[in-house]
Amino acid sequence: MDQFLVQIFAVIHQIPKGKVSTYGEIAKMAGYPGYARHVGKALGNLPEGSKLPWFRVINSQGKISLKGRDLDRQKQKLEAEGIEVSEIGKIALRKYKWQP
């Protein structure tokens, strides 16, 4: 696995239950500012059944970027951790954003 993925995944593993972070914040914390899209691509390529808490990563507007069934799946996982998610996949970053 390349160093970028190692660092990105290490940061994502640190996001605590009941909190979220953004693609851009993950990239910045991993030492790759400006690589938000690459974080999204890396998460999109995860194998089925990955233990990485990918669902805790959302976009900078506080919304789930996925569509359809994938949006529903991410929404369910976040709600199971006590995070309030609107019908359109919006999360209150002021309340749920991870501040390491």
Curated annotation (Swiss-Prot):
Task: Please give the SUPFAM superfamilies that the UniProt record associates with this protein.
Answer: Methylated DNA-protein cysteine methyltransferase, C-terminal domain
UniProtKB keywords? DNA damage, DNA-binding
Q: List where the protein spans the membrane.
A: none
Residue numbers marked as site, Arg finger, required for nucleotide flipping: R37
Question: Hey, where's the site called Required for phosphate rotation/nucleotide flipping on this chain?
Answer: Y23
Question: Would you kindly state one Gene Ontology biological process term found in this protein's UniProt entry?
Answer: DNA repair
Entry GO MF terms: catalytic activity; DNA binding
The effect annotated for Y23F is: Slightly impairs ability to bind alkylated DNA
Does the keyword field hold DNA damage?
A: yes
Whether Transcription counts among this entry's keywords is no
Tell me the impact of changing W54A.
Answer: Exhibits some affinity for methylated DNA
- CDD domains of this UniProt entry? ATase
Identify one Pfam family in the record.
DNA_binding_1
What protein family is recorded? Belongs to the MGMT family. ATL subfamily.
Q: What does this protein do?
A: Involved in DNA damage recognition. Binds DNA containing O(6)-methylguanine. Binds to the damaged base and flips the base out of the DNA duplex into an extrahelical conformation, which allows processing by repair proteins.
In its UniProt entry, what is this protein called?
DNA base-flipping protein
Query: Which species is listed as the source?
Result: Vibrio parahaemolyticus serotype O3:K6 (strain AQ3810)
The uppermost taxa in this organism's lineage are: Bacteria, Pseudomonadati, Pseudomonadota, Gammaproteobacteria, Vibrionales
